[in-house]
């Protein structure tokens, strides 16, 4: 459901034809290009999760940038809802982007990972 909403439905007809024909299309995002395969799109359609429930009592931590233009924060909130555990949290990094790769954001990610491991 994510890939259709966030990618496929935004592709032009030309892009859809190309990815079906070649099996891959390169999407430009900022200074980088990312290969998106048609297999990824098909797998996303087969593996829908938002209508499922995960009942294991496990710790779940999701980290998301508030300024993520690729995947809006609402999707992390939706995914978090499928976990029935009471030990779940969403950490929204203020002004964080999709990659969360700045030193400041990496420090937050490292802190959250340490909390999970310990």
PLM feature spans:
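The alpha/beta-hydrolase serine catalytic core
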Residues: 1-87, 92, 97-100, 104-110, ...
